[in-house]
């Protein structure tokens, strides 16, 4: 999965997919009542990027729905996964469940079109704080009470705080999550980060007792760091330059081993060689 980083304006969906992304990451900010409000990152952000592009969250969802609904004039067949980077740092811990419920209702209405031929992309809820695990239970409760528990088949999870892998496993246990787990590791492109924790995550993914299904590394903009991440065995790379990742995947060393994921590749299944 080539994951376009910080795609917060509707116009950027086309831009990143046209550069080679089959997945995008979108920032979601919340108001003081735990309603998802804007797709917005703000300052500071990655080096070389404009930090202030934004849409109202529900409007972004409508644009995203068009981009992922077969038959729509804006449809992109290869856009198959969306990571919502949930900026829950503005919320109190006891608002996490409400945030999950409100997020689910927004998605149900504006992205899934109330279960009637909505967008088809798989969705990852990426949460920065382990203490906010109830966002997951709230999300699930809302979809169930709205009569669409089947949409949970399209939803996966990530805790993005670079926490100890054992602590992450514990948070999932509390949330009742037993699958659909992506594990991120990374740092802003302005700084360097080694691959030690990525290797631990990959080892967990590949062990019979692990909880992780997929591992992604962020934010990678250079060819050599792309090669290093691929050599470590990641499933996804988040980038500001999807074309760079696509170029490296075309190199002879990687062409035989990796390919770009399509809609038929289940993002919740651990890949077995």
From Swiss-Prot:
Keywords: Cytolysis, Dermonecrotic toxin, Disulfide bond, Glycoprotein, Hemolysis, Lipid degradation, Lipid metabolism, Lyase, Magnesium, Metal-binding, Secreted, Toxin. Pfam families: GDPD_2. It catalyses: an N-(acyl)-sphingosylphosphocholine = an N-(acyl)-sphingosyl-1,3-cyclic phosphate + choline; an N-(acyl)-sphingosylphosphoethanolamine = an N-(acyl)-sphingosyl-1,3-cyclic phosphate + ethanolamine; a 1-acyl-sn-glycero-3-phosphocholine = a 1-acyl-sn-glycero-2,3-cyclic phosphate + choline; a 1-acyl-sn-glycero-3-phosphoethanolamine = a 1-acyl-sn-glycero-2,3-cyclic phosphate + ethanolamine. It is found in: Secreted. Its EC number is 4.6.1.-. InterPro entries: PLC-like_Pdiesterase_TIM-brl. Binds 1 Mg(2+) ion per subunit. Mg(2+) binds at residues 25, 27, 85. The active site is at 5, 41 (nucleophile). Gene3D superfamilies: Phosphatidylinositol (PI) phosphodiesterase. GO terms for cellular component: extracellular region. Expressed by the venom gland. One of its GO terms (biological process) is killing of cells of another organism. SUPFAM superfamilies: PLC-like phosphodiesterases. GO terms for molecular function: lyase activity; metal ion binding; phosphoric diester hydrolase activity; toxin activity. Belongs to the arthropod phospholipase D family. Class II subfamily. Dermonecrotic toxins cleave the phosphodiester linkage between the phosphate and headgroup of certain phospholipids (sphingolipid and lysolipid substrates), forming an alcohol (often choline) and a cyclic phosphate. This toxin acts on sphingomyelin (SM). It may also act on ceramide phosphoethanolamine (CPE), lysophosphatidylcholine (LPC) and lysophosphatidylethanolamine (LPE), but not on lysophosphatidylserine (LPS), and lysophosphatidylglycerol (LPG). It acts by transphosphatidylation, releasing exclusively cyclic phosphate products as second products. This is Dermonecrotic toxin LapSicTox-alphaIB1aiv.
């Amino acid at each position: 999965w080539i994951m376009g980083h910080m795609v917060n304006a509707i116009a950027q969906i086309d831009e990143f997919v046209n550069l080679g992304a089959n997945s995008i990451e979108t920032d979601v900010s919340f108001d003081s009542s735990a309603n998802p409000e804007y797709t917005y990152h703000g300052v500071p952000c990655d080096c070389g990027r404009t930090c202030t592009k934004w849409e109202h969250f529900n409007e972004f969802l409508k644009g995203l729905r068009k981009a992922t609904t077969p038959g729509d004039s804006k449809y992109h067949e290869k856009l198959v996964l969306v990571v919502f980077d949930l900026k829950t740092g503005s919320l109190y811990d006891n608002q996490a469940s409400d945030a999950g419920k409100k997020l689910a209702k927004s998605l149900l209405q504006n992205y899934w079109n109330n279960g009637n031929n909505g967008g088809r992309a798989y969705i990852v809820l990426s949460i920065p704080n382990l203490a906010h695990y109830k966002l997951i239970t709230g999300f699930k409760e809302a979809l169930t009470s709205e009569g669409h528990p089947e949409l949970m088949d399209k939803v996966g999870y990530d805790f993005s705080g670079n926490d100890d892998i054992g602590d992450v496993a514990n948070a999932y246990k509390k949330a009742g999550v037993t699958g659909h787990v992506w594990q991120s590791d990374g740092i802003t492109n302005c700084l360097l980060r080694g691959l030690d924790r990525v290797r631990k995550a990959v080892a967990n993914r590949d062990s019979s007792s692990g909880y992780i299904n997929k591992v992604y590394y962020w934010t990678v903009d250079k060819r050599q760091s792309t090669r290093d991440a691929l050599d470590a065995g990641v499933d996804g790379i988040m980038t500001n330059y999807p074309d760079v990742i696509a170029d490296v995947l075309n190199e002879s060393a990687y062409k035989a081993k990796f390919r770009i994921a399509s809609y038929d590749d289940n993002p919740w299944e651990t890949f077995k060689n």
